[in-house]
Amino acid sequence: MKKFIKMMLCLGLMFILCSCGSDEVELNYTTKKVGDKTVYTIKTKLYVASSEETNLVMINVKDYGIMVAELYPDKAPITVENFKKLVSKNFYSGLIFHRVINGFVIQTGDPNGDGTGGSEKTIKGEFEANGIKNNISHVRGVLSMARRGSNPETEATLNSASSQFYIVQEDATYLDGKYAGFGKLVSGYNVLDKIASVKTNMNDKPLTDIVIENVRFVKYYEE
């Protein structure tokens, strides 16, 4: 009987230890030092930070991992220029994903954390409804600018994008021509899906803050 009790206690302890282990954060990247550089590996792609502006940005989300997006200045020059300026100022560091809808988008870029804020500047909306050609379709992984909407649309709402942007989780091509797509993920789709799956309140805000540690310019690294 004593042996049985001891065995059950051991099994219980093992279960507790295993349960604790499962709560550890599993990130989607590894790092290694090469000289004075830190090389980030995400699957088969290698990235390193860039001191200059590039068309690749790394979005580091605390406890979730890294997403890397390619920007398209040839298709949305005004939007990309504005985004790059904000990245250069570390504007996005410490901001949260304030709007998360599984099967649709994850949204960030608001210093107020509730969808009401932005930067000091608004930009011209680069999309067809505003008279500007932009053939970036809102498919999975696309980055696009959030803006105020109205019915009917006004010049003020069409040109109200500032700093808030969203990443499309599942194809939403009905947004084409109405919102300014400006980039697309090249790495980190598992992070996108992980964020999209969190529990939210009735306003689509995650119950626990999902914080951006930083957004930085990177470039591909070749060994």
Walk through the language-model features, giving the residues of each:
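Sec-dependent N-terminal signal peptides of Gram-positive bacterial secreted proteins and lipoproteins
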Residues: K2-D23
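Cyclophilin-like peptidyl-prolyl cis-trans isomerases
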Residues: C20-E223
